[in-house]
Amino acid sequence: MSLPERPGGSPVYEHRNVYRNSPSRRPRPNDIETGFQSVPRAGHERGKSVSSYAETISNPHANTETLPLSPTHPTASPPPHSPDQPFTRKRSLIRPERNRIDKDHRNYHYHKHAANMETMPSSTGNDPILENVDVSTEPSGGSQTHGSFADSSPPRHHRSRKMSGDDQEKGNTRVKSRPRRSKSGKITKETRHRKSRKNPATAEQIRPPSAWNVYCAIVTFWCPDFMLKCCGKPTKAQRRAWREKMGLISIILVIMAIVGFLTFGFTATVCSAPPERLRVNKVTGGYMIFHGVAYDLSTSHHPPAEGIPLRQDGTGANVLFDLPEKHSGQDGSFLFQNVNGHCKGLINKAPGSDVPTNSDNELAWYFPCTTFNQDGSSRPNFTNPYYLGYACHTSANARNAFYVGLKGAADVYFTWDDIRNSSRNLVVYSGSVLDLNLLNWFNESEISVPDRFKVLRDQDSAVNKAIRGRDVTRMFQSPGDKQVAQCLEEITRVGFVDTETVGCIASKVVLYCALILILSVVGTRFVLALIFQWFISRKYAASKTSQSSDRRKRAKQIEDWSEDIYRAPARLPGDVGSSAMGSSDRTSKRGSSFLPTTSRFSAVYGSDRPTGARRLPTTMSSQGPASALLNPNSIYRQGNDSRASFLRPDPYSSAASPSDGPGPAGFIHDSVVPQPPSDWMPFGFPLAHTMCLVTAYSEGEEGIRTTLDSIAMTDYPNSHKAIVVICDGIIKGKGEAVSTPDVCLGMMKDHATPPDMVESFSYVAVASGSKRHNMAKVYCGFYDYGNKSRIPVEKQQRVPMMLIVKCGTPDEADKAKPGNRGKRDSQIILMSFLQKVMFDERMTELEYEMFNGLWKVTGISPDYYEIVLMVDADTKVFPDSLTHMVSAMVKDPEIMGLCGETKIANKRDSWVTAIQVFEYFISHHLAKSFESVFGGVTCLPGCFCMYRIKAPKGGQNYWVPILANPDVVEHYSENVVETLHEKNLYLLGEDRYLTTLMLRTFPKRKQVFVPQAVCKTTVPDKFMVLLSQRRRWINSTVHNLMELILVRDLCGTFCFSMQFVVFVELVGTLVLPAAIAFTFYVVITSIIHSPPQIIPLVLLALILGLPGLLILVTAHSWSYVVWMLIYLVSLPIWNFVLPTYAFWKFDDFSWGDTRKTAGDKVKKGGIEYQGEFDSSKITMKRWAEFEREKRARSAYFGSRENVVGAPGGWAVPPSHAQTDGYYSDA
């Protein structure tokens, strides 16, 4: 077997053996396509350094132009195929790992970064299979000065690798190209030219208007630009935002109209008011029934006849009330018989009959001309009161008066229960109810009837039993039977079956489907929220912390603690996990490391087969040697006193190493918190290094002190947490004596560099125009609790702290807010830094200082950090919250983000704070608990959340970036924000948009809510401040839900999916004002009119009552019942006032009254473009290049006397040749 070779040292893939391209060859584990690589064999190459930087092997193609990161560059795409080259393997539509990665792919930027990373040498003698990647590529296009040095570094053993398609994360993202950089680390003029072409003013002239802009122009055609200029919209961006706002409002109004139509208008439209109908046996008063129709005869007058005299007023008598025999409510069908129709030929005159006939042998009547009861209780009566044919109304005048002069008032209907009544002999034919007992009224001495009638009326016959109480329409379809049925319909119809129109049936179907859907969503959310609270959430929590293990007692302590923002917890962290030194072996959970866990026959990359023993979760510390985490002064260290031994390939070598000098390894702070062994588990799970990011803007000393105290006093070990504070500009809060950066700097001690010697460094900010260039200072040290601290001295813990102050360029030193670029820019500073560290990419001078500074005060490389906690500067964290959050992250590697519960500390300050208490409660314990079941929490609040920087993937030592993923960083750092949608995402709801971006990039990973993690904060106590805050939150919610609804890969399918839940939530948010108006309308109409609308009232009771039930079954404080009642009273504010104001302020991108500063003037953000970005002021190089130049500027590396706590000194400065290996290693 040949020696291992570097990928660039052998022919390209297409020139090698054709067998590797053959379909008959099965993929091997060491192929790049499979996502795995072999571990280099010992003895053929230099041993791997345990430093936190990648080994670099010299590049034989050092002069080859590197592949730029920018996907728009022509050399970024693979070279076209030439005829003299062998055909390469075609891409398949079936295998997902071979899908085309274009600009619309969710992992586009990640693939670009991964493609530019060098690979480790192969131990099999075969080169890794690389597709569409130049052989000689340099990651991030690093500069190659000092020709003898090779700066192309392969990824470390724990760096992210390009995985197979099945392992790649999925999601759809919008792509933004990265600028191309020159070899010197500067952004080229071509980039500036491309930037100028992206100027909104010129872009709008070239780019054709989109369908959305055309729609907005049509909606607002009535308001031309000159009118908007007169109304305070002078700039084009403001006018465009206003038109887009009106377009959105028009769509919201249409949705409200649709919901209103479905609620009230749909039934009235498709099921209009039917004609009046009267149920059988309910026809009374002035009605009389004829052939199934009730006629109103209460005001009728019958002409004089036998037995019907004139009244005293000379008018005819009323046949219902004036005669001795009352006929009100009776059936008079025999008085106006339907003869000689379909019955002609079936019913004939009997021999010797007195029934009159005409020349066509048509009979004058069939039945005796009398009335009968509508309930069918009358018996046949064949007597004639006065003369033959009395009351038969056979004259033309009489029949015209009835058939033409009278109009039916209502149909008489039978329900199917009435038809199945055993005392009646009823059947249904073509919707008409026929009474077969009326066939018994035939006087067979006068009339001859067919035998079929006799069989049908006989209740003892088999035929009658088969059809009685049923619909016989289908049974009487033959020609002979159809005539019989039609004849029966003419002479025996007593009413109609109870039916509804198709429209009424459709309206009921829609109503009940909507009811079932809403009840299902509401009920499912409630049940799944309970399941999460009772069962799922408990597996995320730490088994033990410094607080009480009794859940009820702990809940009571939290409620008492949250009553006041400055109230201390019931128990301060003590022995458990306070530091690496603070726990005894009895409280630690350590496993034995004496016996080996692998052998030479073990799989290199691990096995996916389940084992009998439960494997511990994977962390950075657990994958590497424990000694790699230790600093020179660690009590766990034995032997070598210099960290340089960890940077050398051979720790026992006697050769000098350049890292023994004053580099990052040379002046680690003497007070650094020692690192414990990797198997030390004080809480029952492996520890993971965590950054605690605190973003500050204009907060005062009291607010910041509260936050930092709570973070520093969490019971999570100080060896595994570091506080990172980023101040967004030199800003002084309203009523404060000093600026916020000065306040934060005063809370530090034991600085690695004296504060007065700290310089400002440049970086690329998230802004437009000249503000893209910003400068910041990096202060590193330890947290200082202060002389007046409420925390006892013996409880104060030593926590490393790094302060980043955005001070701005010298040009803006005299402006109101120098350095201010927004909270998103502060987050991007850290996220971009983490990306550069993980991929070993070129970084700015600021990031280089952050790297070294963090290493100084923590004693470990920044790429050991796996998790970042994000906290606002006015939030206080419960002591064991950080432990519970890290526990969830470590126990479930699929979790990429989580949040805890935020409680209100000023509940009783005013009615404004009182109405927010239950709203906060229900948003966490109902909404977020439900979403956590599916791992899709749609909003991780920026005041208290945690994200995973990178996650273990696949086999041993493989990690994929999560928060540090290039796709997340690229999209979150978008600085060209033009549309109303983008401005609401990036300028108002950046915290929520980060959550959306994570779900969109990694739809198969989880974002959950950890109820055991609790923080408290103060909420607005004035209505105008609340109005301004909720304006931002509601508008951000709408636009983020619009983004999430397009993500198809979320959990579930169709109506049983998170995508459908997001759709329902979006529609529910948009129609909130209409919904509360409809609710009041239903309640008022139900009180005034009768009968009440039962279904809407029941639905309303369920929606409003289930949250109260949630309080009871989850055993929360009974005080929340009172807060719920206050919330219900304030529903018009939550559902009408706040959403309506927010929708009307869609084009307002300012933060309003939420954050006040000294001399602040509220402006609408996101609409100014000031100056031009000069990229030449920003230098970007890899860490090794920065470090080389820094050391080259010194005549020698310095003496050990200059290093804090370092014994001994340098006798002779090391030669330049001795540093070559180190630089390539770094």
Curated annotation (Swiss-Prot):
It catalyses: [(1->4)-N-acetyl-beta-D-glucosaminyl](n) + UDP-N-acetyl-alpha-D-glucosamine = [(1->4)-N-acetyl-beta-D-glucosaminyl](n+1) + UDP + H(+). Pfam families: Chitin_synth_2, CHS4. Residues 1-205, 572-671 are annotated as: Disordered. GO terms for cellular component: cell septum; cellular bud neck; chitosome; incipient cellular bud site; plasma membrane; prospore membrane. SUPFAM superfamilies: Nucleotide-diphospho-sugar transferases. Residues 94-107, 163-172 have a biased composition (Basic and acidic residues). Glycans are attached at N381, N421, N443, N640, N787, N1035. Keywords: Cell membrane, Glycoprotein, Glycosyltransferase, Membrane, Transferase, Transmembrane, Transmembrane helix. Gene3D superfamilies: Spore Coat Polysaccharide Biosynthesis Protein SpsA, Chain A (3.90.550.10). CDD domains: Chitin_synth_C. It is found in: Cell membrane. Residues 66-75, 649-666 have a biased composition (Low complexity). The keyword Membrane applies. This is Chitin synthase IV. The lineage of its organism: Eukaryota, Fungi, Dikarya, Ascomycota, Pezizomycotina.
